[in-house]
Amino acid sequence: MRTGSGAALENVRSDSPEADWYEHFARALAPLRGVGDSDESALPGSVRLLDLLHIEPPTAEAVVAGWSLGGRSTRALLGVGYDGEFAVDLVRDGPHALIAGTTGAGKSELLQTLVATLAVVNRPDEMTFVLVDYKGGSAFAECADLPHTVGLVTDLDTRLVERALVSLGAELRRRETQLAQASAKDIEDYLDKRARGGNVLPPLPRLLLVIDEFASMARELPEFISGLVNIAQRGRSLGIHLVLATQRPGGAVTPDIRANTNLRIALRTTDTSESRDIIDAPDSGDISPANPGRAYARL
């Protein structure tokens, strides 16, 4: 190395890391992705559920044929991610879930997709649904006709909401009794015993309880939310799965709810603080309004 005057410089040491450090740093950054629009463009703008489920045309015969091949699964295919199909498993990732998304983010569509997917892969004697829509019933209107749906509750009938909690408590006790009579430690043990015994034991379908706008319910019926926490705690081993969804999670996600919901999905939120309430990260607050259905999941 020489100076501007041409004089040679010796014993010069570069003020930079060793070559190995660059490789280490690059490998550490490789799995990380930015949050900007250019990164979001790597994902499709929309995905047809029928294409993912491979049931085109969607006939009753095609669904029944799928049931005949198994008809029992806790895996729900929800869309497409960077690495291909994106699915969640109520047992592996749950057993309970928390979902948030502001107006226009695609929350209702996500809930419908969750219910529809599980209906396709489960016979009605393997999984049932109780759907609670605290916005008035629009989100689950089509789902009410599924043979799996055993209850649809809306905010239009407060007494029915209160009765639903009593009924869920009775269902917990019934399941505990049924497992005890079969000497089964949990729902998986019971289902295995039933399969090995030629289905002599009576059916015990998993129960998916989906509540849209639970934040509004928490304000108007706080005792219902307390009851739900009890159901979440006791229902883990009984085959009961709770999905809580809201537009505005602020203040509604209590420590008890957070402790009992391992699976969390955040569509676009109004700000980064609401994103942190759900997935413990700010990212969903930066999702573009031009991308409804885009979400981050904490598994």
Region spans (language model):
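Conserved AAA+ ATPase small/helical "lid" subdomain
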Residues: 2-54, 286-299
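Phosphate-coordinating loops and pocket residues in cytosolic domains that bind phosphorylated ligands
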Residues: 280
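AAA+ P-loop ATPase motor domain of ring mechanoenzymes
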Residues: 30-84, 89
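Amphipathic alpha-helical surface "interface" segments used
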Residues: 49-56, 185-201
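P-loop NTPase catalytic phosphate-binding loop
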Residues: 1-26, 64-186, 199-277, 286-288
